[in-house]
C-alpha cells in the first residue's frame, strides 16, 4: 500500500474508533499506526499537503481524547516522537496543532502511575518539542505540568528525574511568565536547595540541567548573585567547560553550550569570562571537539564559538587559537603527542564548511559565519599576514561553494545551497577589505565564475520572470536576489584586480533582469541589504543603458503590493469571526454568480449573432476584428468562471476547517470555564494563605539561614576539590617530563649503538679499499707509459691543425663584416619595437579609461592587435636571423681558439 492509502486508512480507522471505541476498532487504528511508523514518512508529513495535515490533526485529536486505550496512547506518542525528528514537522506539531498542550494533558492523566511508559515517552517528546522554543504558559495543562515537574524533581530520584529536569529547563529558558509563576510558589526556596544539591551529582546531565534552571530563575536575583559571584564564577566556568568537553552525550553538550551562551548575554559574566585564566586551555579543548563528532555536537560547538565572537576580547583569543594553534596547550586526551596538521582547528573548520548538503545539521553555514568573524578580527587588528596560510587553505573550498550545482530536485537542498552561497560571498567580501588577503582571492576568483553564478540565479530561481514579479512571494527569490547583489558587490571590489571583471561587472549592471533584485534590496527591512543595494545603484546609475525608469516602477509596484497585502491581512483578521457563519451564504452566492455568468455568456453570443445579421454589408476584415474582440471577452469570462469554481471549492474547504475550529473553540471555552472556576477557588485559597504567611515567614527565615550554611559548605567543598585538581595537574606535568626524559635517553642509547656498528663496518671496508688501491697503482703505472706515446702522436696532429686554422681566420673576417651590417639592422628594428611599445601602452591606457564603452571600441582594438602581431612577427623573424648569426660567430671564435678538434668542425655552416 502506498503512503496516501495508508493515511486514508488511518483516517477511516480513527473515524470508526471515535464513533465506537471497540477493541476491533482500536486494533485497526493500532495496525494503521504501525504501518505508517514502518514507512518512515517523516519528510511527507513536513509538506503542506492536505492529506498529511489531516493525518497529523487526527493523531493529535486521538491523543487529546482521555478515553482511548493506554496501548493506543503509547503507539500515538511513539509515532509522534518519530515524526518530531524532522524540524519542520516538529514546528508544525508545536505551533499549528498545539501538541505541547495536548502532551501536557497526557502527562497529567498518566502522572498517577509513574511506571507507565506513556509518561516517560510523553515527557521526552515534550522535551524535544520545547527545546530552544518559548512556550505559551496559558492553560490548566501547562500549570499542572509545571507543578508535576517541580514535585517530581524534589521527590526520590528515579528514571523520570533527568527528563523532568530537562523539560523544566526548557520551560524556564527565555520564558518570563513561567519564571514568574515558579518564583511565586511557596516552596521555591526548597526547590532552589534541591537544585543546588544536584550540582554535586555524579551525572553531568543532571548537573547541567540543574544549573540551567538556576541560571534562568536566579541570574538577576540575590541567589543568582551569590551563585555566580566573582568568587565562584571561575569554578562555574570550569564546571561548564568540563561538561562541554566530557559530557555524557550530545544532549548534555547541547544544554551546556546553551547555558554558557545564556551566561555570556550577561555583561558581568562575559567580563568574568574574559578574565578567566584557564579560558585559553578550555578553548583549545573545545576546538578539539570539532574532530570526529556527530553533526549535532559540531553545530552546537560552532554556535558556542560564534557566541564567543560577540565579546571582542574572546574573539581575539578565538582568532589566535584558530590561526596560531601552536600556542595552545594540548588537550588531556592527546597530551603525549604533538598536535598534527590534520588536527588543527583551521583544518577541522574547513572540513566542516565543506559538509554535504544532505546532512541533518548545516554545519557549513555556521562555519562560514565563524570564518567571517575571524577575518573581521584579523583585519581590525591589522594582523593579516598571520591569516595568509589559512586563506590559501580556505579559498578552494569557498570557490567550490560558488560552483553552480546540477539540477537539484529537493527544494530544501536548493535552499541550503543558496544559503551557503550567501555566507561564502560574505566571507570573500570581508577578505577584499584587506589588500594582502584581497590579492590571494583575486588570484583564484575569475570573472567567468561570478558571471555564471549570477546567470544561474537569473535562470533557475525565477527572478527573471519579468517586470512586476512579486519578490516577496518566494523565499528562494529572496535568496537569489541576495546572491546576485552580493556577487555584484564582490565584483565591484575586485574589478581592478581580476582580468575581465570590470567589463563583466558593467555589462551585468545594464541588464534589465537586475531590476527585481535591486527592488528587493532597496525595499528590504534589513539594513545590510539596503546598503548593498545602494552601493550597486550608485555604480549603475551613471551608465547609459541602466533602466532607471523600470526600477522606479518596480519599486512602486512592490510597495503597492505590500500595502495591499497589509490591507488584506487586516481585512482577514476583521472578517475571521463572521466568515465561519457566512460560509454557506458565500458558497450559494458563488453558485448564483456562476449561473449569472453563464447567462451573460449566452446573451453575448446572441448579441454577436444579431450584430452579424444586421451588419452583413460590412467587410470581412471588420467582422474578423469583431470576432477577435468577442473571443477575447469569452476567454476572459471562461477564466473568471474557472476562478469562481476554484473559489467555491476553497470556500467548501474553509467550511470544513471552520467546523473543526468551532469544535476546538468549544473545547477551549470549556477549558476556560474550568480555569475560571479553579481561579475562583485559588482566590479563596490565597485569602486563606495570606493569614498563614506571618507564621510561615519565621520558618522561611530559618530555611534561608540553613540554605546559606549549605551554600557555604558547598563552596568549601568546591575549593578543596579545586586544590586537589591543581595537585593532580602538577603530578601529571611531572610525570610527562619524566617520561619525555626517559624516551630521550632511550633514543640516545639506540643512536650510539647504531654508530658503533657503522664504524666497525667502515674499518673493514677501508682495509679492502687499501688492497684495491695498491692494485690500481700498478695498473696506472703501465697506463702512464702508454699515454706518453699517445701524447707524442697528438703533438704531431696539432701542428697539422694550426695550418687549417690560419685558412679559417680569413673566412672569419668576411663574416664579421656581415655581422656589423646585421647589427645595424638590429638597432633599427629595436627602435621600431620601442615605438610600437609606446603605441601599445597608449592603447592600453585608452582601453582602461573607456572600459564602459568597450563594445564600441572593439573594432579599433582588433585592428591595433593585427598591426601589433605583424610587427611582432617581423621582430621575431629578425631575432631568429640574429640568433643564427650569433651562433655562427660563436662557432668561428671557438674554432679560432682551438677548442674544437678538426673532425668536430661543421664546414657546412
Curated annotation (Swiss-Prot):
Transmembrane regions listed in the UniProt entry: none
SUPFAM superfamilies xref list: ARM repeat, Tropomyosin
GO annotation (BP), single: DNA damage response
UniProt keyword annotations, A-Z: Chromosome, Coiled coil, Cytoplasm, DNA damage
Subcellular location: Cytoplasm; Chromosome
GO molecular function: protein phosphatase inhibitor activity
Positions occupied by motif Nuclear export signal: 602-616
Pfam families to which the protein is assigned, alphabetical: CIP2A_N (PF21044)
Ranges in coiled-coil conformation: 630-888
InterPro entries noted in UniProt: ARM-like, ARM-type_fold, CIP2A, CIP2A_N
Broad class of the protein's primary localization: cytoplasm
GO cellular component: chromosome; cytoplasm
Similarity comment text for this entry: Belongs to the CIP2A family.
Function: Acts as an inhibitor of protein phosphatase PP2A. Together with TOPBP1, plays an essential role in the response to genome instability generated by the presence of acentric chromosome fragments derived from shattered chromosomes within micronuclei. The CIP2A-TOPBP1 complex tethers chromosome fragments during mitosis to ensure clustered segregation of the fragments to a single daughter cell nucleus, facilitating re-ligation with limited chromosome scattering and loss.
Quaternary organization: Homodimer. Interacts with TOPBP1; forming the CIP2A-TOPBP1 complex.
Protein name in UniProt: Protein CIP2A homolog
Source species: Gallus gallus
Amino acid at each position: 500500500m502506498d503512503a496516501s492509502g495508508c493515511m486514508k486508512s488511518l483516517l477511516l480507522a480513527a473515524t470508526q474508533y471515535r464513533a465506537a471505541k471497540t477493541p476491533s476498532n482500536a486494533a485497526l487504528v493500532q495496525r494503521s499506526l504501525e504501518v505508517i511508523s514502518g514507512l518512515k514518512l517523516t519528510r511527507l508529513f513536513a509538506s503542506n499537503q492536505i492529506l498529511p495535515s489531516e493525518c497529523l490533526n487526527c493523531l493529535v485529536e486521538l491523543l487529546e481524547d482521555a478515553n482511548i486505550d493506554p496501548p493506543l496512547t503509547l503507539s500515538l506518542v511513539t509515532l509522534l516522537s518519530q515524526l518530531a525528528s524532522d524540524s519542520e514537522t516538529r514546528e508544525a506539531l508545536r505551533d499549528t496543532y498545539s501538541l505541547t498542550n495536548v502532551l501536557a494533558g497526557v502527562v497529567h492523566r498518566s502522572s498517577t502511575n509513574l511506571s507507565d511508559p506513556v509518561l516517560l515517552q510523553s515527557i521526552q517528546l515534550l522535551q524535544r518539542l520545547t527545546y530552544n522554543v518559548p512556550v505559551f504558559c496559558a492553560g490548566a495543562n501547562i500549570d499542572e505540568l509545571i507543578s508535576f515537574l517541580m514535585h517530581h524533581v524534589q521527590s526520590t530520584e528515579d528514571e523520570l528525574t533527568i527528563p523532568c529536569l530537562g523539560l523544566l529547563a526548557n520551560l524556564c529558558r527565555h520564558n518570563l511568565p513561567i519564571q514568574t509563576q515558579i518564583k511565586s510558589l511557596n516552596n521555591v526556596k526548597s526547590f532552589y536547595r534541591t537544585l543546588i544539591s544536584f550540582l554535586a551529582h555524579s551525572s553531568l546531565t543532571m548537573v547541567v540541567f540543574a544549573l540551567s534552571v538556576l541560571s534562568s530563575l536566579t541570574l538577576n536575583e540575590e541567589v543568582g548573585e551569590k551563585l555566580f559571584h566573582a568568587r565562584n564564577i571561575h569554578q562555574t566556568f570550569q564546571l561548564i567547560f568540563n561538561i562541554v568537553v566530557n559530557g555524557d552525550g550530545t544532549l548534555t553538550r547541547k544544554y551546556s553550550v546553551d547555558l554558557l551562551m545564556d551566561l555570556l548575554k550577561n555583561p558581568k559574566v562575559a567580563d568574568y569570562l574574559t578574565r578567566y585564566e584557564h579560558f585559553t586551555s578550555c578553548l583549545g579543548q573545545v576546538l578539539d571537539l570539532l574532530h570526529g563528532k556527530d553533526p549535532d555536537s559540531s553545530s552546537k560547538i560552532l554556535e558556542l564559538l560564534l557566541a564567543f565572537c560577540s565579546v571582542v576580547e574572546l574573539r581575539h583569543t578565538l582568532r589566535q587559537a584558530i590561526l596560531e594553534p601552536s600556542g595552545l596547550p594540548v588537550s588531556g586526551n592527546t597530551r603525549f603527542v604533538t598536535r598534527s596538521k590534520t588536527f588543527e582547528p583551521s583544518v577541522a573548520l574547513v572540513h566542516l564548511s565543506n559538509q554535504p548538503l544532505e546532512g541533518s545539521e548545516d554545519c557549513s553555514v555556521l562555519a562560514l559565519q565563524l570564518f567571517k568573524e575571524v577575518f573581521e578580527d584579523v583585519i581590525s587588528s591589522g594582523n593579516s599576514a598571520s591569516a595568509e596560510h589559512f586563506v590559501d587553505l580556505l579559498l578552494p573550498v569557498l570557490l567550490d561553494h560558488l560552483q553552480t550545482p546540477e539540477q537539484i530536485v529537493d527544494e530544501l537542498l536548493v535552499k541550503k545551497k543558496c544559503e551557503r552561497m550567501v555566507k561564502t560571498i560574505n566571507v570573500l567580501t570581508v577578505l577584499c577589505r584587506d589588500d594582502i588577503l584581497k590579492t590571494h582571492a583575486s588570484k583564484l576568483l575569475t570573472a567567468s565564475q561570478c558571471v555564471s553564478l549570477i546567470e544561474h540565479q537569473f535562470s533557475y530561481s525565477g527572478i527573471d520572470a519579468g517586470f512586476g514579479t512579486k519578490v516577496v512571494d518566494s523565499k528562494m527569490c529572496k535568496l537569489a536576489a541576495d546572491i546576485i547583489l552580493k556577487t555584484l558587490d564582490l565584483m565591484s571590489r575586485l574589478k581592478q584586480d581580476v582580468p575581465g571583471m570590470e567589463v563583466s561587472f558593467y555589462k551585468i549592471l545594464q541588464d534589465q533582469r537586475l531590476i527585481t533584485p535591486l527592488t528587493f534590496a532597496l525595499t528590504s527591512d534589513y539594513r545590510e541589504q539596503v546598503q548593498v543595494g545602494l552601493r550597486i545603484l550608485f555604480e549603475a546609475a551613471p551608465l547609459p543603458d541602466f533602466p532607471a525608469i523600470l526600477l522606479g516602477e518596480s519599486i512602486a509596484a512592490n510597495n503597492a503590493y505590500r500595502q495591499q497585502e497589509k490591507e488584506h491581512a487586516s481585512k482577514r483578521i476583521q472578517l475571521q469571526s463572521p466568515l465561519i457563519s457566512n460560509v454557506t451564504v458565500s458558497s450559494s452566492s458563488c453558485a448564483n454568480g456562476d449561473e449569472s455568468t453563464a447567462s451573460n455568456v449566452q446573451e453575448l453570443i446572441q448579441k454577436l449573432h444579431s450584430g452579424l445579421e444586421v451588419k452583413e454589408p460590412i467587410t470581412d476584415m471588420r467582422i474578423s476584428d469583431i470576432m477577435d474582440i468577442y473571443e477575447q471577452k469569452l476567454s476572459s469570462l471562461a477564466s473568471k468562471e474557472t476562478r469562481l469554481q476554484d473559489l467555491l471549492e476553497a470556500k467548501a474547504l474553509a467550511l470544513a476547517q471552520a467546523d473543526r475550529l468551532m469544535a476546538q473553540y468549544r473545547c477551549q471555552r470549556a477549558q476556560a470555564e474550568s480555569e475560571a472556576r479553579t481561579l475562583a477557588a485559588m482566590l479563596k485559597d490565597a485569602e486563606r494563605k495570606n493569614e498563614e504567611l506571618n507564621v510561615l515567614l519565621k520558618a522561611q527565615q530559618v530555611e534561608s539561614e540553613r540554605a546559606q550554611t549549605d551554600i557555604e559548605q558547598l563552596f568549601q567543598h568546591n575549593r578543596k576539590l579545586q586544590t586537589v585538581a591543581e595537585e593532580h595537574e602538577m603530578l601529571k606535568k611531572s610525570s610527562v617530563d619524566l617520561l619525555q626524559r626517559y624516551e630521550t635517553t632511550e633514543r640516545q642509547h639506540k643512536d650510539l649503538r647504531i654508530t658503533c656498528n657503522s664504524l666497525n663496518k667502515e674499518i673493514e671496508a677501508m682495509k679492502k679499499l687499501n688492497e684495491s688501491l695498491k692494485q690500481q697503482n700498478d695498473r696506472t703505472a703501465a697506463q702512464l707509459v702508454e699515454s706518453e706515446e699517445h701524447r707524442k702522436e697528438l703533438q704531431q696532429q696539432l701542428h697539422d691543425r694550426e695550418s687549417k686554422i690560419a685558412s679559417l681566420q680569413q673566412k672569419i673576417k668576411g663574416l664579421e663584416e656581415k655581422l656589423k651590417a646585421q647589427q645595424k639592422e638590429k638597432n633599427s628594428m629595436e627602435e621600431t619595437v620601442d615605438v610600437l611599445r609606446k603605441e601599445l601602452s597608449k592603447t592600453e591606457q585608452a582601453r582602461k579609461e573607456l572600459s564602459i564603452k568597450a563594445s564600441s571600441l572593439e573594432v579599433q582594438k582588433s585592428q591595433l592587435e593585427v598591426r601589433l602581431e605583424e610587427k611582432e612577427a617581423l621582430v621575431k623573424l629578425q631575432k631568429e636571423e640574429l640568433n643564427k648569426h650569433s651562433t655562427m660567430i660563436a662557432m668561428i671564435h671557438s674554432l679560432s681558439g682551438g677548442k674544437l678538434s678538426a673532425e668536430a668542425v661543421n664546414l657546412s655552416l
